Amino acid sequence: MAGKMKLFSVTSERPLATKIADYLDIPLCEVELQKFSDGEVKINIEESIRGTNAYVVQSMNSNVNERLMELLIMVDALKRASVHSINIIMPYYGYARQDRKARSREPITAKLMANLIQRAGADRLITVDLHAAQIQGFFNIPIDHLSAIPLIGDYLIENYGEKDVVVVAPDHSGVVRARRIADRLNAPIAILNRKPRPHEDEIMSVIGDVKGKVAIVVDDIIDTGVRATTSADILLEKGAVEVIACATHSVMAGNATERLQNSNIKEVITSDSIDLPEDKQFDKLTTISIGRILGRAIEGVQENRSLHPLF
């Protein structure tokens, strides 16, 4: 790819962007972001970037609407600064759970997100463990859909590989994700048969044997923590000796951290796709960095190499 590499962080993922910069051995470019009294945002890039390949790190965490607007303004600033290409590094893709019309007269906001990012001028999106892989089809630009599952799998092998484990999909749609972890651990899988009702979390049955085993529940997102804690309760009721909760993205909305810390879950394993503030940290939480795989992805894009090993 023609053009020198330039790495930017807008607001949401400065710690992760710093890890990526350290891996690539390049500095983060200076960006001045002003917020006016009415909430408007203004961005100024503090150096010449004409003809470069811009890589912008921005997750859709905390206030997703504000993060999205910052990103769109940043993309516009880069385009008007005559960069060669604009590559978005969005570890956590916001609105991913609104990927279809579940009921009549509902929007498909994940598609709207794709439209906005493309119309603003982005040339590529690099993301991690989309809630629904088919969201890739909402884009007409290249998407590199990476996964934190291998990193989480390696951690589980190191810490639970000698134990009798079962990998649990929290619902039927999570079986593929659970299977990837189970294959790495050479372990069986179980499935929680949930009743698909909005605003309810009722588990009707457990499909598979969990008795006497360490149950590892694998999900893509931990939001309020209710789904993880109810999963743990039913698995322990069915005879599991311990429950470990894993998810790539830790939203930790509301009192999720308190709920998880006080739950029957032994350990919560997640990535740094979302930067959690100090008040969202808790003793049971283990965070695995995805900075290296994102850095390798940027290297691959920059040097026109295959990213297949990162998927």
UniProtKB/Swiss-Prot annotation:
Pathway: Metabolic intermediate biosynthesis; 5-phospho-alpha-D-ribose 1-diphosphate biosynthesis; 5-phospho-alpha-D-ribose 1-diphosphate from D-ribose 5-phosphate (route I): step 1/1. This is Putative ribose-phosphate pyrophosphokinase 2. PROSITE patterns: PRPP_SYNTHASE (PS00114). GO terms for cellular component: cytoplasm; ribose phosphate diphosphokinase complex. CDD domains: PRTases_typeI. PANTHER family: RIBOSE-PHOSPHATE DIPHOSPHOKINASE FAMILY MEMBER, RIBOSE-PHOSPHATE PYROPHOSPHOKINASE 1, CHLOROPLASTIC. Transmembrane segments: none annotated. Homohexamer. One of its GO terms (biological process) is ribonucleoside monophosphate biosynthetic process. It catalyses: D-ribose 5-phosphate + ATP = 5-phospho-alpha-D-ribose 1-diphosphate + AMP + H(+). Its cofactor is Mg(2+). Gene3D superfamilies: 3.40.50.2020. The gene is prs2. Mg(2+) 2 binds at residue 171. It comes from the Bacteria. Belongs to the ribose-phosphate pyrophosphokinase family. Class I subfamily. Its EC number is 2.7.6.1. ATP binds at residues 38-40, 97-98. Disulfide bonds: none annotated. It is found in: Cytoplasm. Involved in the biosynthesis of the central metabolite phospho-alpha-D-ribosyl-1-pyrophosphate (PRPP) via the transfer of pyrophosphoryl group from ATP to 1-hydroxyl of ribose-5-phosphate (Rib-5-P). GO terms for molecular function: ATP binding; kinase activity; magnesium ion binding; ribose phosphate diphosphokinase activity. InterPro entries: PRib_PP_synth_CS (IPR000842), Pribosyltran_N (IPR029099), PRibTrfase_dom (IPR000836), PRTase-like (IPR029057), Rib-P_diPkinase (IPR005946), Rib-P_diPkinase_bac (IPR037515). Binds 2 Mg(2+) ions per subunit.
